Amino acid sequence: MELPEGSLVTQPAPAGFVVRKATMADLGGLISLFTDAGEMSRSPAALERPLRDRRVWLASMNGEVVAAALTNAETETLGMIGGVYTAPKWRGRGLSQAVCSAISEELISLGKQPTLYWQNEAAGHVYRKLGFRQIGIWRSVRLALR
């Protein structure tokens, strides 16, 4: 999906939550968030890399990291958003929308078009509400090494 120019529907942080750009000091909280994320799980190194070289946005409640979005790759003109995850007990409050909105705003301010792909309909619904539109189908194949 891509976010056409001028189509972002911004989503503020829900009441009681803080949405902000993450720093290296947030690594522990991000590791805790993604530890039990199933197929969304990420190693500490996979979280440290975007903190250092790209961008990560998070939502927190009383200092606890409860949702996040990051860029998996960036070029001069594009930013591939991924790692969008909300802890199960905090779902349904608009947190994924809020962190995706924030990271998209930052990418746009840098002259980069936000892009992403999704694997479940709930995620697709969130992205469409923000203004993203389908531009094709992404296929991913994993091969086992012997």
Would you name each region that the model predicts?
Residues 1-15, 139-143:
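Acyl-donor-binding surface of acyltransferase catalytic domains
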Residues 18-30:
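A short beta-loop-alpha structural element at the N-terminal edge
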Residues 22, 32-42:
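Helix-loop element at the rim of GNAT/NAT acetyltransferase active sites that forms part
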Residues 25, 76, 121-122:
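Short alpha-helical
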Residues 42-85:
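A conserved beta-strand-loop-helix scaffold within acyl/acetyltransferase catalytic domains
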Residues 82-88, 92-109, 124-129:
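Conserved acetyl-CoA-binding loop-helix of GNAT-fold acetyltransferases
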Residues 97, 120-137, 144:
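Conserved active-site alpha-helix within GNAT-family acetyltransferase domains
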Residues 107-119:
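Conserved GNAT acetyl-CoA-binding A-motif
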